[in-house]
């Protein structure tokens, strides 16, 4: 697949261009510099050509992240066949722009100088100065207004090799990592991909943006989404936006990794667990930093996990250490297993055999001596598996009984680990407002 990197100093519109080209809002965009710290990937289709775009952090930012961001950008360059060098010519060329240009020359990749924020022809005189960078004719665009993007991509295509033979497209499993800041999400992502795609530090909230990273495991394609940590009280506008992004990442995922610190589970984790459960997506609780738990405290830590995450007790757990690569492959193997179950369908005859045996063996709820009777069961949806149960009185079904029944369905029908939904439909001799008699 073709790869193209987008580079430039902070706040010249790299992420706006990235979002415009891939057709959705992936990177955090704001009016202050240094918003994108990590290199993130997105897929675009241009005239039937599949292109992976890599959006890099702002180079020569002059802050504590400068060296780490440059290293991520260099990683992005390794597989890129062309580079889109984004500048804001209205501000004039800065020393940082010239440093980026010198750095690009040393890398030896084809470079397309891209003058962003050229919203009309009256701004085009600003382009003259860009010739001095030595990369040829600049392309004028406005990412915000989608101006000049075809000209830009036509120039990019000149540097890309001919496509190989078509390869059958395997639908990827999209997995989001959610968790509070500094719980180890980015370290886990780096351990899985065997790279340093996400910046890792000891500061909360290091990853502000969501990173989409494609990866293969066991013949299966994955898209790993590393979200910004959700905080209870955001202290800046960007953290507030990161909360929304984390929630949105859950919705566009197939499987959710809820990453928790083995020794510190609080209200943040409960909130995230509720969000994950409500989404109907399979949840895997990733207990990170397990290697830091003393042997004498393993049982008590496990008990604490059971108590605090009891409402998603059906969710499987994987115990990991990103530093030691412990449990890393189990995360992906479990995700593949749950994804398959999540989309499974069970035949109606099998369901009703199970329902008949269940009612013979188990006590059912009753109201004033009148029992709940379940006549028929069928699966009406997948992802998550959703079952309609036809009964005499839906109002006899308590929340506790429904939860009990969901657990038994998971246990008996090979749906362990996935959320199950039930829809109750009234049918038969008992109707609300009628006599409760046989």
From Swiss-Prot:
Gene3D superfamilies: 3.30.300.20, P-loop containing nucleotide triphosphate hydrolases. SUPFAM superfamilies: P-loop containing nucleoside triphosphate hydrolases. Keywords: GTP-binding, Nucleotide-binding, Repeat, Ribosome biogenesis. Residues 344-428 form the KH-like domain. GO terms for biological process: ribosome biogenesis. GTP 2 binds at residues 179-186, 226-230, 288-291. Residues 2-164, 173-343 form the EngA-type G domain. InterPro entries: G_ENGA (IPR031166), GTP-bd (IPR006073), GTPase_Der (IPR016484), KH_dom-like (IPR032859), KH_dom-like_a/b (IPR015946), P-loop_NTPase (IPR027417), Small_GTP-bd (IPR005225). GO terms for molecular function: GTP binding; ribosome binding. Belongs to the TRAFAC class TrmE-Era-EngA-EngB-Septin-like GTPase superfamily. EngA (Der) GTPase family. GTPase that plays an essential role in the late steps of ribosome biogenesis. Associates with the 50S ribosomal subunit. PANTHER family: GTPASE DER (PTHR43834:SF6). This is GTPase Der. It comes from Deinococcus radiodurans (strain ATCC 13939 / DSM 20539 / JCM 16871 / CCUG 27074 / LMG 4051 / NBRC 15346 / NCIMB 9279 / VKM B-1422 / R1).
């Amino acid at each position: 697949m073709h790869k193209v990197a987008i580079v430039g100093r902070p706040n010249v519109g790299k992420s706006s261009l990235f979002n415009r080209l891939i057709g959705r809002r992936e990177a955090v965009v704001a009016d202050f510099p240094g918003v994108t710290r990590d290199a993130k990937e997105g897929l675009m289709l241009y005239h039937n050509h599949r292109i992976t775009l890599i959006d890099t952090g702002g180079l020569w930012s002059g802050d504590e992240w400068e060296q780490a961001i440059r290293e991520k950008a260099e990683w992005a360059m390794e597989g890129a066949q062309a580079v889109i060098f984004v500048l804001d010519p209205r501000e004039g060329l800065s020393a940082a722009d010239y440093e980026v240009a010198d750095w690009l020359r040393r890398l030896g990749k084809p470079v397309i100088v891209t003058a962003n924020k050229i919203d009309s022809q009256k701004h085009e005189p600003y382009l003259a100065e860009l010739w001095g960078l030595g990369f040829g004719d600049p392309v004028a665009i406005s990412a915000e207004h989608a101006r000049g993007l075809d000209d830009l991509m036509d120039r990019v295509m000149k540097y890309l090799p001919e496509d190989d033979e078509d390869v059958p497209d395997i639908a990827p499993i999209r997995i989001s990592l959610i968790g509070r800041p500094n719980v180890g999400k980015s370290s886990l992502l780096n351990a899985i991909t065997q790279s340093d795609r996400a910046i890792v530090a000891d500061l909360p909230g290091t990853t502000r943006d969501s990173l989409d990273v494609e990866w293969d495991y066991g013949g299966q394609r994955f898209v790993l989404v590393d979200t910004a940590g959700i905080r209870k009280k955001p202290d800046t506008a960007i953290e507030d936006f990161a909360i929304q992004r984390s929630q949105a990442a859950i919705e566009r995922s197939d499987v959710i990794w809820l990453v928790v610190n083995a020794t510190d589970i609080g209200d943040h984790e409960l909130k995230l667990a509720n969000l994950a459960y409500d989404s109907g997506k399979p949840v895997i609780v990733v207990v990170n930093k397990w290697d830091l738990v003393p042997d004498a405290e393993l049982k008590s830590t496990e008990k604490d996990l059971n108590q605090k995450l009891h409402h998603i007790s059906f969710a499987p757990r994987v115990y990991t250490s990103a530093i030691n690569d412990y449990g890393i492959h189990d995360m992906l193997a479990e995700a593949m297993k749950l994804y398959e179950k999540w989309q499974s369908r069970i035949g109606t005859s099998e369901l009703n055999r199970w329902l008949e045996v269940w009612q013979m063996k188990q006590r059912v709820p009753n109201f004033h001596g009148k029992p709940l009777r379940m006549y028929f069961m069928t699966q009406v949806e997948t992802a998550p598996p959703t079952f309609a149960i036809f009964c005499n009185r839906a109002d006899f079904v308590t929340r506790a009984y429904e939860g009990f029944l969901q657990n038994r369905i998971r246990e008996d029908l090979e749906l362990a680990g996935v959320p199950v939904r039930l829809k109750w439909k009234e049918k038969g001799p008992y109707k609300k407002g009628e006599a409760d008699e046989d």
